[in-house]
């Protein structure tokens, strides 16, 4: 346990005093909340009796009276504590001792009171009785505002905010609004699908084969079955199995996991939505997608427009449609149509794009598009008709066998949706899988290394013409809430392990300080400078090396100790 601050020690002393007074600082009883800060303000009527509960966020004590702010799930309300209103008899200890001396900012309290308006027009609760519901032992990281209105000590450090999201939500109300909008997005999308008659389903998170995408999976082991299992990287192949089974429209909000890098737009655990509808194609899905996103934008923000950085995005349908070949030709002057792999590789080099021999034709085209085209699409734009090599699960284009019936939706230079006319020819699908294995063997890190034979068996029973679409929910809510980082739209993003201060002995600290000044010393000299006995010296040097603070090196000149 880390050392307690002075404030934390004082709060623990108050906790003990409360218990001495017979007050349970963490009561189990239900508290009969009848009102919220929002409902009080909306339905305000002078003299009305209310019962509210929340967190004490500020207070100004002036002798026998005190104004304070109470924060609940819907906002803040001013409350007024008056000693004689709370303590109507001779015993004034509830105000003088409990409220004034033993409560702190951050404590949860329940309040019974009457409504009134202050002289300056503030809607306020006159406290008639209060109950301590939970004692806070750690002070909140609240900002201070000085006489000039400048804010100090604001809780804005991103790493601290993500690690302590619970504190972030309390002291930064705008953060909570992001997650309220996130829930609105999920609800709006779910309603849209349900109204269309599609079924929400659940598919396995632990899978025997990591299929449906090319990504590095998290691997675990099932002890009872003695087999490896993979955390889901995508749910596509299971949803298609359900189309084979007779469902004509299925969707799932899935937690997916990819054991890859982290940056401003990628988290190892993320949320995707995938939907599959029988008897449709990618043209229908484009129409469906833009109607869906227009509906969601209005549900989240009340308008189809959303600010993102310096851009204003408009999700109002319809969206522009551009083929990948036309996009590359427009931005580079190079026409990829009917070009060989060697010609495309040479063109990429001429465009100063880093390529290597492991890249096949599809990967090369993807690199050109990513480097030269993708970032130019700010408003929602469909990029369509991808090369077959880039889309192993997608149906061959009806008029050009080199292409597939696929689109990606670009917004602000990023892909937020990916959709196909799904491949339902089991023989073609098997050949595509086998080709992917060959690409993976060449070193293509975006090619899949597994063949899902059970999925092929399902296709052999027959799958109707189907269109499917996946949407990155985290990225979509980033655009709808003007957040540049995925960490801002996840309650608890993945973080590196928190660095904790090492607890080492005083002797080890003293020796380490000596070592830091010199960086490297002969072991015998360091021991002599330390003045420690043989026993204490052995213990100290072991402690420093064990905690990776120092290392002992043997050289021709003797034993030396250095700082790690």
Walk through the language-model features, giving the residues of each.
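Class II aminoacyl-tRNA synthetase catalytic cores and aaRS-like
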Residues: 1-503, 550
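Residue-level "edge-of-site" marker
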Residues: 31, 206, 540, 557-558
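Short, cationic-aromatic polyanion-contact patches
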Residues: 501-508, 522, 552-564
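Hydrophobic residues on short alpha-helical segments
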Residues: 508-515
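Short acidic, hydrophobic short linear motifs in intrinsically disordered regions
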Residues: 517-530
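Short amphipathic alpha-helical interaction segments
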Residues: 532-545
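Short, solvent-exposed alpha-helical "recognition" segments
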Residues: 545-551
């Amino acid at each position: 346990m880390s050392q307690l601050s002075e404030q934390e020690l004082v709060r623990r002393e108050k906790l003990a005093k409360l218990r001495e007074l017979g007050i349970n600082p963490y009561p189990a009883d239900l508290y009969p909340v009848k009102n919220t800060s929002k409902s009080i303000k909306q339905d305000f009527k002078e003299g009305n009796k209310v019962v509210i509960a929340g967190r004490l966020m500020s207070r100004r004590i002036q002798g026998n009276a005190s104004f304070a702010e109470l924060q609940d799930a819907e906002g803040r309300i001013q409350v007024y504590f008056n000693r004689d209103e709370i303590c109507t008899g001779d015993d004034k200890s509830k105000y003088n001792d409990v409220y004034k001396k033993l409560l702190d900012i951050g404590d949860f309290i329940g309040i019974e009171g009457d409504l009134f308006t202050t002289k300056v027009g503030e809607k306020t609760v006159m406290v008639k009785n209060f109950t301590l519901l939970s004692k806070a032992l750690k002070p909140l990281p609240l900002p201070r505002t000085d006489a000039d209105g400048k804010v100090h000590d604001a809780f804005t450090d991103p790493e601290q905010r993500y690690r302590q999201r619970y504190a972030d939500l309390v002291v930064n109300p705008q953060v909570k609004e992001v997650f309220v909008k996130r829930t609105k997005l999920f609800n709006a999308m779910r309603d849209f699908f349900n109204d269309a008659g599609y079924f929400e389903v659940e598919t396995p998170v632990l899978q025997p084969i990591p299929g449906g995408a090319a990504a590095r999976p998290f691997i675990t082991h099932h002890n009872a079955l003695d087999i490896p299992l993979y955390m889901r990287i995508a749910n596509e192949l299971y949803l298609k199995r359900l189309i084979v089974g007779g469902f004509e429209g299925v969707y799932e909000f899935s937690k997916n996991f990819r054991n890859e890098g982290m940056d401003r737009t990628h988290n190892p655990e993320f949320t995707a939505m995938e939907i599959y509808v029988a008897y449709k194609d990618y043209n229908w899905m484009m129409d469906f997608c833009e109607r869906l996103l227009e509906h969601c934008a209005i549900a989240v923000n009340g308008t189809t427009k959303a600010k993102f950085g310096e851009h204003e995005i408009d999700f109002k349908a319809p969206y522009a449609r551009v083929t990948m070949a036309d996009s590359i030709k427009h931005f580079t002057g190079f026409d990829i149509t009917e070009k060989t792999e060697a010609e495309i590789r040479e063109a990429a080099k001429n465009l100063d794009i880093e390529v290597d021999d492991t890249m096949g034709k599809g990967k090369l085209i993807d690199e050109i598009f990513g480097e030269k085209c993708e970032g130019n699409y700010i408003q929602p734009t469909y990029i369509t008709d991808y090369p077959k090599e880039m889309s192993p699960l997608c149906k061959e284009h009806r008029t050009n066998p080199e292409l597939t019936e696929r689109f990606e939706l670009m917004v602000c230079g990023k892909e937020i949706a990916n959709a196909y006319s799904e491949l339902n020819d089991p023989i073609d699908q098997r050949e595509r899988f086998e080709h992917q294995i060959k690409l993976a063997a060449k070193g293509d890190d975006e090619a899949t290394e597994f063949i899902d034979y059970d999925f092929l068996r399902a296709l052999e029973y027959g799958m109707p013409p189907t269109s499917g679409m996946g949407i990155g929910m985290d990225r979509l809510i980033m655009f709808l809430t003007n957040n540049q980082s995925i960490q801002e739209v996840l309650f608890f993003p993945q973080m590196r392990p928190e660095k904790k201060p090492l607890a080492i002995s005083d002797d080890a600290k003293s020796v380490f300080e000596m070592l830091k000044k010199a960086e490297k010393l002969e072991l015998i000299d360091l021991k002599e400078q330390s003045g420690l006995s043989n026993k204490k010296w052995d213990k100290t040097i072991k402690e420093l090396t064990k905690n990776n603070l120092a290392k002992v090196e043997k050289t021709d000149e003797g034993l030396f100790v250095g700082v790690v």
